[in-house]
């Protein structure tokens, strides 16, 4: 069961409460290049990204972000560190959310100015604790970046905002170490009811980063922890969105795109199942429909899996049986399997509309 958290809104996207876990990403373009950043945001939105974050290293980036926000199809969050003037500038430009740790931007009056501007516009603030940048006093107290140190850091930042009467807050606790991240979120979830942004930071490249993120986020989501997520990968941010939705789909928390089931193959397989499955996956990638498609290689599990799917192929010697809703449609030669599956999917979609 999902943990009950308060609900905030990032632009038009609800986060927390009964809202489904949303999928975020972060642009890796230079924010000062508004054209390139908007191109990437549009690509992310096309992949299903619901919230996007942009780095704001200087005033030129803050000014560009205003124009980016006005043309973005999805809510935009500004990632701010140290300089409160950058936060004020992006708030003035209509930003949908801030990622900002109030303890890192100097004197209290600076925090008060940022909070006043955020309150005026109902802009939420994400407190983002990272194991790699904990306060020196916490490192001295705990010896190294422990889960407890991360939680104490987060609560310290929360306290600053609460003292100023601001509760439009969400929190993240990220480390590249999966068990540490999981432990930190579990501890924090027992202490507060603010919505939680979950992620494994610096997770790695597409292969290793996907695995780390799937394990860490999967554990948290199965525990009911997580109101919005970002999969951090070294590479194209569009892949972060795809992986994020696949993690949610695997736990039946979100449905986006077609669910492809395919067997790993073994010595009984007598067709080029890998080639068929890869072609089917590629051709179905742009279809956002709640369907299960099975590509199975032999008579052991194939017919059963194919029958359970909306559409499926169960392979034999150079051919296979095409199933739809548990019923055999026809026998299909191996060379035509991908085309037959795609055609059947298109037929179902046409009938639904």
UniProtKB/Swiss-Prot annotation:
This is 4-hydroxy-3-methylbut-2-en-1-yl diphosphate synthase (flavodoxin). The keyword Iron-sulfur applies. Pfam families: GcpE. Converts 2C-methyl-D-erythritol 2,4-cyclodiphosphate (ME-2,4cPP) into 1-hydroxy-2-methyl-2-(E)-butenyl 4-diphosphate. It catalyses: (2E)-4-hydroxy-3-methylbut-2-enyl diphosphate + oxidized [flavodoxin] + H2O + 2 H(+) = 2-C-methyl-D-erythritol 2,4-cyclic diphosphate + reduced [flavodoxin]. Its cofactor is [4Fe-4S] cluster. Gene3D superfamilies: Dihydropteroate synthase-like, Sulfite Reductase Hemoprotein, domain 1. Its EC number is 1.17.7.3. [4Fe-4S] cluster binds at residues 263, 266, 298, 305. Belongs to the IspG family. PANTHER family: 4-HYDROXY-3-METHYLBUT-2-EN-1-YL DIPHOSPHATE SYNTHASE, 4-HYDROXY-3-METHYLBUT-2-EN-1-YL DIPHOSPHATE SYNTHASE (FERREDOXIN), CHLOROPLASTIC. It comes from Geobacter sulfurreducens (strain ATCC 51573 / DSM 12127 / PCA). Binds 1 [4Fe-4S] cluster. Keywords: 4Fe-4S, Iron, Iron-sulfur, Isoprene biosynthesis, Metal-binding, Oxidoreductase. It comes from the Bacteria. GO terms for molecular function: 4 iron, 4 sulfur cluster binding; 4-hydroxy-3-methylbut-2-en-1-yl diphosphate synthase activity (ferredoxin); 4-hydroxy-3-methylbut-2-enyl-diphosphate synthase activity (flavodoxin); iron ion binding. Pathway: Isoprenoid biosynthesis; isopentenyl diphosphate biosynthesis via DXP pathway; isopentenyl diphosphate from 1-deoxy-D-xylulose 5-phosphate: step 5/6. The gene is ispG. NCBIfam families: ispG_gcpE, PRK00366.1. InterPro entries: Dihydropteroate_synth-like_sf (IPR011005), IspG_bac (IPR016425), IspG_bac-typ (IPR004588), NO2/SO3_Rdtase_4Fe4S_sf (IPR045854), RibuloseP-bd_barrel (IPR011060). One of its GO terms (biological process) is isopentenyl diphosphate biosynthetic process, methylerythritol 4-phosphate pathway.
